[in-house]
Amino acid sequence: MSEPIDQSEAERHRAKMAKRKAVQDAEVADKTIEKGLLMVHTGTGKGKSTAAFGLALRMLGRGHRIGVVQFIKGAWHTAERDALKKFGDQVVWHTMGEGFTWETQDRSRDVAAAERAWAKAQELIADPSFSLIILDELNIALRYEYLDLASVLEALTTRRPGLHVVVTGRNAKPDLLTAADLVTEMTLVKHHFSAGVKAQPGIEF
């Protein structure tokens, strides 16, 4: 059990928190812009796509419609897709990839799949019924130059003002990071895979 706080310590804490609240309130009041955000989840750590789907859940809770295009993941069945599809036509999900590049081992096939995925992404971006578009593993397609970076950036930066877009995947291009409103880098500190623990249902897929 913790020691009781004396009156002087309680007062110091109250004054400190009041000052902190005043600073926070001033910072919040200063922010007046409302716009669709371009968000990038990158880095070597786990959780880039998972974070994007968590954001999707929040948008769905607000009654918004979301679209998902997966650029790399192909036949790999994921539980998050099953969960989000329960929202019916509030969620449109397209898995366009054919697996990771080391699985296909066919560049022309990978390029064709990426181009199909990007065409579908552009359809969703142009559809005013969507509030959030998740471009899962687009960074990988850009890294291997399956798509033209300049064309992708043009489409993302000239999209309609209210549309939010999340791009996921390792090795995000510097120009994409510059264009983004929010960049989160997942840093690998420790991963169970290195200890011989396999991918598990509900954790990895």
Residue ranges and their predicted role:
Residues K21-Q24, E115-A119, V165-T168:
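Short gly/ser/thr-rich secondary-structure transition/capping motifs
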Residues E34-K35, R62, S129, P161:
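Residue-level preference for short coil/turn positions at secondary-structure junctions
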